[in-house]
């Protein structure tokens, strides 16, 4: 099992994954990122027309790189710190001697 999948599994089991997602959603809403991305989607759809030839997948492919660059550094740093704290907890739990009683 890779470190990434172990962390992923741990965060799912402990409920930390949903806490991280909730934190991310709230921070992106607070900073106006969600509104910016929503507006970007509307503008792209208006440019491409409404003839239904532009798919959701195409919209996602076009918006995703731009949207990622708009995520504020403060939000990225906060999430990285949260993930580091989780990794530290995992490491500390792994280092604790097992109770042999």
Curated annotation (Swiss-Prot):
Compartment annotation: Nucleus, Nucleoplasm; Cytoplasm
One Pfam family in the UniProt entry: EnY2
PANTHER family to which the protein is assigned, alphabetical: ENHANCER OF YELLOW 2 TRANSCRIPTION FACTOR (PTHR12514)
Top-level taxon: Eukaryota
Protein name per the record: Enhancer of yellow 2 transcription factor
Disulfide feature: none
Assembly behavior: Component of the nuclear pore complex (NPC)-associated AMEX complex (anchoring and mRNA export complex), composed of at least e(y)2 and xmas-2. Component of the SAGA transcription coactivator-HAT complexes, at least composed of Ada2b, e(y)2, Pcaf/Gcn5, Taf10 and Nipped-A/Trrap. Within the SAGA complex, e(y)2, Sgf11, and not/nonstop form an additional subcomplex of SAGA called the DUB module (deubiquitination module). Component of the THO complex, composed of at least e(y)2, HPR1, THO2, THOC5, THOC6 and THOC7. Interacts with e(y)1. Interacts with su(Hw) (via zinc fingers).
Entry keyword set: Activator, Chromatin regulator, Cytoplasm, mRNA transport, Nucleus, Protein transport, Transcription, Transcription regulation, Translocation, Transport
Protein's organism: Drosophila simulans (Fruit fly)
Single GO term (MF): C2H2 zinc finger domain binding
Homology family: Belongs to the ENY2 family.
Keyword Nucleus: yes
GO biological process: heterochromatin boundary formation; mRNA export from nucleus; poly(A)+ mRNA export from nucleus; positive regulation of transcription by RNA polymerase II; protein transport; transcription elongation by RNA polymerase II
Function (record text): Involved in mRNA export coupled transcription activation by association with both the AMEX and the SAGA complexes. The SAGA complex is a multiprotein complex that activates transcription by remodeling chromatin and mediating histone acetylation and deubiquitination. Within the SAGA complex, participates in a subcomplex that specifically deubiquitinates histone H2B. The SAGA complex is recruited to specific gene promoters by activators, where it is required for transcription. Required for nuclear receptor-mediated transactivation.
Annotated HAMAP family: ENY2_Sus1
GO CC, one annotated term: DUBm complex
Signal peptide coordinates: none
């Amino acid at each position: 099992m890779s470190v990434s999948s172990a962390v992923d599994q741990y965060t799912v089991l402990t409920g930390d994954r949903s806490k991280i997602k909730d934190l991310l959603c709230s921070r992106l809403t607070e900073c106006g990122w969600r509104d910016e991305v929503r507006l970007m989607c509307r503008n792209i759809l208006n440019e491409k027309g409404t003839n239904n030839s532009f798919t959701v997948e195409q919209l996602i492919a076009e918006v995703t790189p731009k949207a990622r660059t708009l995520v504020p550094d403060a939000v990225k740093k906060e999430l990285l710190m949260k993930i580091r704290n989780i990794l530290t907890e995992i490491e500390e739990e792994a280092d604790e001697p097992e109770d042999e009683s």
